[in-house]
């Protein structure tokens, strides 16, 4: 069992929105690893970061991602920083990984004043976002099997583009 697609990208790139729509279009479930982490620990991501630190959060995240890659056969949406873990990057090998690309300006606009993003909290959000992009974009590109520009594209158009590039059998082919 393996996910149909694994979505990666910076905060605001559309992983949750695109994930929901893509899963619906494919007739499969969506597993968001950030939600799975909160369910598993009974704590918010912001609380884990504040209390235990980023390193402990990344350890928990890697465990959740590895389990999801082994057990989930729908669409998998990873937290924006999951690819910073070498173990996660290695585990993604052989999977269909879709990098939802976004510009820094669009990412800052989309994330707005969202307080549930610990690494973007506080002043100078635009600078923090650009720093995250500089660190993570090369990692997203390294693990991606498909790159999709989400700038100035509505979610429906992004999903249609992904569907056109996925190797998805039609219902009649799947029945044979």
Curated annotation (Swiss-Prot):
Binding site for Mg(2+): 16
GO molecular function: ATP binding; magnesium ion binding; shikimate kinase activity
Record text on cofactor binding: Binds 1 Mg(2+) ion per subunit.
Keyword terms, alphabetized: Amino-acid biosynthesis, Aromatic amino acid biosynthesis, ATP-binding, Cytoplasm, Kinase, Magnesium, Metal-binding, Nucleotide-binding, Transferase
Reaction catalysed by this enzyme: shikimate + ATP = 3-phosphoshikimate + ADP + H(+)
GO process terms (BP): amino acid biosynthetic process; aromatic amino acid family biosynthetic process; chorismate biosynthetic process; shikimate metabolic process
EC id: 2.7.1.71
The keyword Transferase is annotated on this UniProt entry: yes
Gene3D superfamilies on file: P-loop containing nucleotide triphosphate hydrolases
LID domain as annotated region, ranges: 112-124
Annotated metabolic or biological route of this protein: Metabolic intermediate biosynthesis; chorismate biosynthesis; chorismate from D-erythrose 4-phosphate and phosphoenolpyruvate: step 5/7
Cofactor: Mg(2+)
PANTHER family, sorted: SHIKIMATE KINASE (PTHR21087), SHIKIMATE KINASE 1, CHLOROPLASTIC (PTHR21087:SF16)
Function: Catalyzes the specific phosphorylation of the 3-hydroxyl group of shikimic acid using ATP as a cosubstrate.
Anything else known: The phosphoryl transfer proceeds by an in-line associative mechanism. The random sequential binding of shikimate and nucleotide is associated with domain movements that suggest a synergic mechanism by which binding of the first substrate may enhance the affinity for the second substrate. Was identified as a high-confidence drug target.
Domain comment (free text): Consists of three domains: the CORE domain which forms the binding site for nucleotides, the LID domain which closes over the active site upon ATP or shikimate binding, and the substrate-binding domain which functions to recognize and bind shikimate.
Name by which UniProt lists this protein: Shikimate kinase
Phylogenetic placement of the source organism: Bacteria, Bacillati, Actinomycetota, Actinomycetes, Mycobacteriales
């Amino acid at each position: 069992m393996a996910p149909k697609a694994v979505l990666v990208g910076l905060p605001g790139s559309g992983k949750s929105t695109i994930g929901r729509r893509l899963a619906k279009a494919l007739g499969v479930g969506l597993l968001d690893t950030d939600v799975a982490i909160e369910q598993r620990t009974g704590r918010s991501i912001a609380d884990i970061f504040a209390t235990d630190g980023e390193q402990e959060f990344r350890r928990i995240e890697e465990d959740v991602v590895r389990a999801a890659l082994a057990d989930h056969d729908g669409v998998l949406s990873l937290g924006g920083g999951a690819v910073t873990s070498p173990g996660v990057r290695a585990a993604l090998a052989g999977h269909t990984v879709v990098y939802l690309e976004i510009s820094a300006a669009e990412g800052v606009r989309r994330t707005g004043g969202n307080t549930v993003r610990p690494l973007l909290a506080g002043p100078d959000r635009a600078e923090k976002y650009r720093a995250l992009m500089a660190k993570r974009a090369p990692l997203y590109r390294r693990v991606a099997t498909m790159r999709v520009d989400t700038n100035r594209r509505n979610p429906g158009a992004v999903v249609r583009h992904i569907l056109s590039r996925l190797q998805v059998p039609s219902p009649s082919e799947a029945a044979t």
